[in-house]
A protein has these predicted regions:
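N-terminal acidic leader/helix
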Residues: 2-29
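Short, charged, intrinsically disordered terminal tails
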Residues: 4-7, 62-72
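Amphipathic alpha-helical coiled-coil segments and their boundaries
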Residues: 7-10, 14, 40-43, 47-50, ...
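Alpha-helical transition-metal enzyme core signature, strongest for iron centers
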Residues: 17, 21-25, 47, 51-61
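Short E/K-rich amphipathic alpha-helical oligomerization segments
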Residues: 22-46
Length: 72
């Protein structure tokens, strides 16, 4: 069972993870464009997919944060 301290940590960690993932996703998009520019379309597609998946992860983390805030 989560302790109050664990819940407090989650309130700090979730926004941090969301921001961190967004920064990585932006970097992935930048590198996908660079890969595309040098003719590496398949590589670019995989990197872009990773960026998109981080976006999905952030949606889940944001939903978790919202539920945590509603429970408070």
């Amino acid at each position: 069972m989560a302790t109050t301290t664990d819940l407090e940590k989650l309130r700090v960690l979730l926004p941090h993870w969301i921001e961190h993932n967004a920064e990585h996703a932006a970097g992935f998009q930048e590198w996908a464009e660079k890969a595309r520019a040098v003719g590496q379309e398949e590589v670019a597609e995989e990197i872009a997919l990773a960026a998109k998946e981080l976006g999905w992860a952030n949606e889940a983390l944001s939903a978790a944060l919202k539920k945590l805030e509603q429970a408070a």
